């Protein structure tokens, strides 16, 4: 697929400088781009690459208008513009509508005529699959579950009974939506299972990465609001609420009944304690442990930066002796005060 720069500007806006008839076929990084590619620069430190790039055109911020003679589109947010161009040039493959002969669909399930159900997929009793949605190979949509319009469930997704997915949702391979939450009552040294009778409710325009698990609620529902983006290998426990348009990176764990606000960003491998609330717009750095509520919007970090092993060992020894050091400092302060009082 080839598209002219003029067509891109007509579709996405921006200011075009140079040859409007120049066609591009693909997006590419500046250092590997060829004449049929369009690249982008969103940070000034990369402007020097414009001198050597083979790209046929570039996307730049307005203040970089004169940084190159290449045909260019000027826009306040080059990264967003690049994303939209990439989506235009790389449309996802669309399987044919219909139910594969090797799929299993319950007699009372409702599947839109233009939906696609792949081989090995199972659609349970009373389940509903919306218009133009795609259910990948060997995926399971449980009894009474709902999948909205224009959704994509990749291969081997499990959507448990009663759970609901909004419109334009993407669930990547290996997702498990609606498994039982980790609920057990102690009884004389043993554990008795607590039925998890809530659901998982996923809003519109959500994307969930591969092998991420979202547990169903114990009594109330686990809720993923609209526009949330979850990376791979995330654990979302029962009764969690993740606010709209928050983004969470891989390997993060969120314990039960935590409430994460809207427009939050959480770095990879962060750990969130249960039964706490995090304010809208909060940023949490990678590998950070959040042990209590964050009522104030801000950026929070708890991870220690790396060091050479020998240096780390020495610092670890100092950490273990902090109590002794604090005691010695207090004793010294006391003696200094006594000396000052005598004089």
From Swiss-Prot:
Q: Top enzyme class of this protein? A: transferase
Q: Which terms in the Gene Ontology molecular function aspect does this entry carry?
A: N-acyltransferase activity
User: Which residues carry out catalysis?
Assistant: 238 (proton acceptor)
The record's GO CC annotations read: membrane
Q: Kindly indicate whether the keyword Cell membrane belongs to this entry.
A: no
Q: Which family does it belong to?
A: Belongs to the transferase hexapeptide repeat family. LpxD subfamily.
Which gene name does the record give? lpxD
Protein name per Swiss-Prot or TrEMBL: UDP-3-O-acylglucosamine N-acyltransferase
**Upper lineage ranks?**
Bacteria, Pseudomonadati, Pseudomonadota, Betaproteobacteria, Nitrosomonadales
């Amino acid at each position: 697929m080839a598209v002219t720069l003029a067509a891109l500007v007509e579709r996405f806006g921006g200011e075009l400088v140079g040859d409007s008839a120049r066609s591009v076929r693909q997006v590419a990084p500046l250092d590997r781009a060829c004449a049929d590619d369009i690249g982008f620069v969103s940070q000034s430190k990369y402007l020097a690459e414009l001198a050597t790039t083979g790209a046929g055109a570039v996307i730049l911020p307005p203040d970089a208008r004169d940084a190159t003679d290449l045909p260019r589109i000027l826009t306040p947010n080059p990264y967003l513009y690049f994303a939209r161009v990439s989506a235009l040039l790389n449309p996802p493959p669309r399987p044919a509508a219909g139910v594969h002969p090797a799929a299993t669909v319950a007699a009372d399930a409702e599947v839109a005529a233009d939906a696609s159900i792949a081989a090995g997929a199972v659609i349970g009793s009373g389940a509903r699959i919306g218009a133009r949605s795609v259910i990948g190979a060997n995926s399971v949509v449980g009894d009474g579950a709902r999948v909205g319009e224009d959704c994509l469930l990749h291969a081997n997704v499990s959507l448990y009974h009663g759970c609901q997915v909004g419109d334009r949702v993407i669930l990547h391979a290996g997702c498990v939506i609606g498994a039982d939450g980790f609920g057990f009552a102690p009884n004389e040294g043993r554990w008795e299972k607590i039925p998890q009778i809530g659901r998982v409710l996923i809003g519109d325009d959500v994307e969930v990465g591969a092998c991420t698990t979202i547990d169903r609620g114990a009594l109330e529902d686990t809720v993923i609001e609209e526009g949330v983006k979850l990376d791979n290998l995330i654990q979302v426990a029962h009764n969690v609420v993740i606010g709209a348009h928050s983004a969470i990176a891989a390997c993060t764990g969120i314990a039960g009944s935590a409430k994460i606000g809207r427009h939050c960003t959480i770095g990879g491998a962060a750990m969130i304690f249960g039964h706490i609330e995090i304010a809208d717009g909060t940023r949490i750095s990678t590998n950070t442990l959040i042990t209590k509520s964050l009522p104030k919007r801000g950026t929070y970090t708890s991870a220690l930066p790396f060091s050479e092993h020998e240096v780390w060992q020495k610092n670890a020894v100092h950490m273990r002796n902090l109590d002794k050091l604090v005691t010695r400092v207090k004793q010294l302060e006391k003696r200094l005060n006594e000396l000052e009082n005598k004089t």
